[in-house]
UniProtKB/Swiss-Prot annotation:
The keyword Ion transport applies. It is found in: Mitochondrion inner membrane. This is ATP synthase F(0) complex subunit a. The chain crosses the membrane at residues 12-32, 68-88, 97-117, 138-158, 164-184, 189-209. Its main location: mitochondrion. One of its GO terms (biological process) is proton motive force-driven ATP synthesis. It comes from Oryctolagus cuniculus (Rabbit). Subunit a, of the mitochondrial membrane ATP synthase complex (F(1)F(0) ATP synthase or Complex V) that produces ATP from ADP in the presence of a proton gradient across the membrane which is generated by electron transport complexes of the respiratory chain. ATP synthase complex consist of a soluble F(1) head domain - the catalytic core - and a membrane F(1) domain - the membrane proton channel. These two domains are linked by a central stalk rotating inside the F(1) region and a stationary peripheral stalk. Belongs to the ATPase A chain family. InterPro entries: ATP_synth_F0_asu, ATP_synth_F0_asu_AS, ATP_synth_F0_asu_bact/mt, F0_ATP_A_sf. Pfam families: ATP-synt_A. The lineage of its organism: Eukaryota, Metazoa, Chordata, Craniata, Vertebrata. SUPFAM superfamilies: F1F0 ATP synthase subunit A. It catalyses: H(+)(in) = H(+)(out). GO terms for molecular function: proton channel activity; proton-transporting ATP synthase activity, rotational mechanism.
Length: 226
């Protein structure tokens, strides 16, 4: 029986019950909160990365936007660790599920937009009509800008889902090809296996880059509204 190509993206269950909630909570165990005065190297590295990311993202924000710093650093750490854990054999990647990514994107986007309408009402409404727009084009541009605003969370979720899913599918296909070529052409199988190793290294980079891109876009939406 041939294995379904998308079987690895099915939500895992235990005794008929979905255990995706436990999988989502698992990355939090990788970031402990030590009680010792002197941290070890792992915790020090995590803190250094968090400070570096915050410095890059919070530089452009106003004091109101910087109150979101803890949420943004938690978001990038969660998505990055989830993507990396999904590269382990026989594991499940929650970020390949569009429903989960929409569950992250919509509240974050809505929070940024609501913040903008609450504290910068005129500036937020001005985004719907660019300055210098000819009068006949005003209705059409307002509709276009409104659609572009509401499509932002969908673009956030689809981008993350598509990139992670495509990488996993490509690794699955190349891995299956390498296994099938072992008995036919060992030399070709070796070349395919080397390509698979290089692709795996690339996927590690993609996992971190997609976490950064998702968080950066949320940060930009927040910057536009604070």
């Amino acid at each position: 029986m041939n294995e379904n190509l998308f079987s690895s993206f099915a939500t895992p269950t235990l005794m008929g019950l979905p255990i995706v909630a436990l999988i989502i909570m698992f990355p939090t165990l990788l970031f402990p909160s030590p009680s010792r005065l002197i941290n070890n190297r792992l915790v020090s590295t995590q803190q250094w990365l968090a400070q570096l990311i915050l410095k890059q993202m919070m530089l452009m924000h106003s004091p109101k936007g910087r109150t979101w710093s803890l949420m943004l650093i938690s978001l990038i750490m969660f998505i990055g660790s989830t993507n990396l854990l999904g590269l382990l054999p026989h594991s499940f990647t929650p970020t390949t599920q569009l429903s989960m990514n929409l569950g992250m994107a919509i509240p974050l986007w809505a929070g940024a937009v609501i913040t903008g309408f609450r504290y910068k009402t005129k500036a937020s409404l001005a985004h719907f009509l660019p300055q210098g727009t000819p009068i006949p084009l005003i209705p059409m541009l307002i509709v276009i800008e409104t659609i572009s605003l509401f499509i932002q969370p969908m673009a956030l979720a689809v981008r993350l889902t598509a990139n992670i899913t495509a990488g996993h599918l490509l690794m699955h296909l190349i891995g299956g090809a390498a296994l099938a070529l072992v008995s036919i052409s060992p030399t070709t199988a070796l070349i395919t296996f080397i390509i698979l190793i290089l692709l795996t290294i690339l996927e590690f980079a993609v996992a971190l880059i997609q976490a950064y891109v998702f968080t950066l876009l949320v940060s930009l939406y927040l910057h536009d509204n604070t």
